Design a protein with these regions (language model features):
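Membrane-interface helix-loop junctions and terminal tails of multi-pass membrane proteins
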Residues: 3, 8-10, 15-252
């Protein structure tokens, strides 16, 4: 069967309509899990690095762009190996959209969480003795929380996370559709992630990603850990909604 040049380029880049789907031997699956761990490691490193060490004047803009750029770069780097999820909510949303094998969900999520936690451990070590006991307070500040950053409470944080994660999945499914221009999916996904961080950092410190929330909460103290449930439930709920809606919109 003769296929168009755009479709061939998309398949060679790993951004097929079956986004994130992997096949083949155990060795290939091991590489896919390693790619997910490395990609999530890079994402959480971007969050920690930008939030902890960027100039105060840069604020949320630095964090938002760091996250977007990290996902864009890693999607091009390893997206053809694993599909470039780097996010348990994305994995589950793609299952809801019929784009990913549910049997691979648990290994993917474990790899993502492991990569994120390792990144948080490294940045906790980088802070070292410079801040003493203040390291815990610093990680609390970059963890996903509600109620402590202003007037936004549990309901606002939950709704924000559901909405932005649903929109994120709709975008992912759309830009990886067979009918979408080839080669641009990582750019659109990275820019969308930047936008959603700009929107949600003042409300919930921007999660969209349970692995990212877990990673920073590990060193964020009791407060961050006690609120962690929201940043698993809301993004996953939003991702499933977005997966179902995205599948409906892209049906041919």
């Amino acid at each position: 069967m003769i296929r168009g040049r755009g479709q061939c380029l998309r398949e060679r880049a790993g951004w097929t309509p079956n986004f994130g789907e992997t096949e083949g031997s155990m060795n290939f699956n091991s590489r896919a899990l390693a790619a997910e761990a490395v990609g999530t490691f890079a994402l959480v490193s971007a969050v920690c690095g930008a939030a902890l060490f960027s100039a105060p004047s840069a604020g949320l803009v630095a964090v938002a762009f760091a996250v977007g750029i990290s996902v864009l770069a890693m999607a091009y780097a390893v997206g053809h190996i694993s599909g470039g999820h780097f996010n348990p909510a994305v994995t589950l949303g793609l299952i809801a959209a019929g784009r990913f094998d549910s049997g691979k969900a648990v290994p993917y999520i474990i790899a993502q969480c492991a990569g994120g936690v390792v990144a948080a451990v490294i940045f906790y070590m980088i802070l070292g003795g410079a801040m003493g006991g203040g390291k815990w307070n610093t990680f609390t500040a970059i963890s996903n929380t509600y109620g402590g950053m202003g007037q936004f409470g549990l309901g606002a944080a939950f709704l924000m996370e559901v909405v932005i994660t649903a929109l994120f999945l709709i975008i992912i499914i759309g830009v990886t559709s067979r009918r979408a221009p080839a080669g641009f999916a990582p750019i659109a996904i990275g820019l969308a992630l930047t936008l959603f961080h700009l929107m949600s950092i003042p409300v919930s410190n921007a999660s969209l990603n349970p692995a990212r929330s877990l990673a920073t909460a590990v060193f964020g103290g009791v407060g961050a850990l006690s609120q962690l449930w929201l940043f698993w439930v809301a993004p996953i709920l939003g991702a499933v909604i977005g997966g179902v809606v995205g599948r409906y919109l892209q049906e041919e």
